[in-house]
Amino acid sequence: MTKDIMDAVFIKEMAKTTSNLYRLGWDERNGGNITYLLDEKEVVEYLDVKQIIRTIPMDFDGKKLAGKYFLVTGSGKYFKNVEEAPAVNLGVIQVSEDGKAVHLLWGYTDGGLPTSELPAHFMSHIARLSVDPENRVVMHCHATHLLAMTFTHELTEREFTRTLWQMCTECLVVFPEGVGIIPWLVPGTNEIGEATSEKMKENRLIVWPHHGIYGAGKSMDETFGLIETAEKAAEVYTIVMSQGGIKQAITDEQLKALGERFGVEAKAGYLNN
């Protein structure tokens, strides 16, 4: 006999995280989406994986994820409602063996579908797993100050990253590889998924100009914390600029010393010699 899935740690983590994202104002209305890669042993405690509720086709090749299980936020669903109604707003899915569809095993009880950004998420999972087999989470949100920076700051990866590093001491330690930036592209398309996943091979944070940010990590906390740290730096930058601009900042020499102390190395070429 399986356990009640409402007691599952992964459901509780997802509900807590989506509530926090909404509370912070980063996922207004139905903005934002999360995919959480689950181990089969986690899933079978709560679900009979042979009981498929329905099969949902995909318009891209997900064969590299064949057989894998994911907890996914629903298309058009509001993050503010997840905690009260997980079964309506979330779904547990398994990628079909041919990679052309997903099998719904639980959730979306009102007939809903996985997030429209599923191609970008799955492509990002494939990219991250190729360089980090422990990656489990891909998270997209509209972090306010990072989004604002894409209108006012130079959109080159090096300069954008350097500004974030200089705003908060912890930034270099948390994301020494910097942030990736893609061009503005139509959301929900394979094109934006391909652009994002290409950047995910080297970065865990990808900025979507005038839209939001993608983050990836080994756990829900790590991924949330990654975005949270970059967003804090962007908020500090916004305040600094409103106060008249930068008069002094963390120097490159100090960033190098910081990296040495915490055992991280800034992305090659991002610090001046």
Swiss-Prot record:
InterPro entries, from UniProt?
Answer: Aldolase_class_II_sugar_metab (IPR050197), Aldolase_II/adducin_N (IPR001303), Aldolase_II/adducin_N_sf (IPR036409), Rhamnulose-1-P_Aldolase (IPR013447)
List ligand-binding residues for Zn(2+).
H140, H142, H211
Q: What cofactor does this chain's UniProt record say it requires?
A: Zn(2+)
- GO cellular component terms attached to this protein's record: cytosol
Q: List the EC numbers from the record.
A: 4.1.2.19
Answer whether the UniProt record assigns the keyword Cytoplasm to this protein: yes
Pfam families from the entry? Aldolase_II
- Main subcellular localisation: cytoplasm
Any idea which residues are catalytic in this one?
E117
Cofactor comment text: Binds 1 zinc ion per subunit.
- From the UniProt record, give one GO term of the biological process aspect: pentose catabolic process
Record SMART domains: Aldolase_II (SM01007)
Query: What is this enzyme's catalytic activity, as reactions?
Result: L-rhamnulose 1-phosphate = (S)-lactaldehyde + dihydroxyacetone phosphate
The annotated pathway is: Carbohydrate degradation; L-rhamnose degradation; glycerone phosphate from L-rhamnose: step 3/3
Q: Which GO terms describe its molecular function?
A: metal ion binding; rhamnulose-1-phosphate aldolase activity
The protein's UniProt keywords, in alphabetical order, are:
Cytoplasm, Lyase, Metal-binding, Rhamnose metabolism, Zinc
Subcellular localization, as worded in the UniProt entry: Cytoplasm
What's this chain's function? Catalyzes the reversible cleavage of L-rhamnulose-1-phosphate to dihydroxyacetone phosphate (DHAP) and L-lactaldehyde.
Family to which this protein belongs = Belongs to the aldolase class II family. RhaD subfamily.
Official protein name in the record: Rhamnulose-1-phosphate aldolase
Q: What is the lineage of its organism?
A: Bacteria, Bacillati, Bacillota, Bacilli, Bacillales
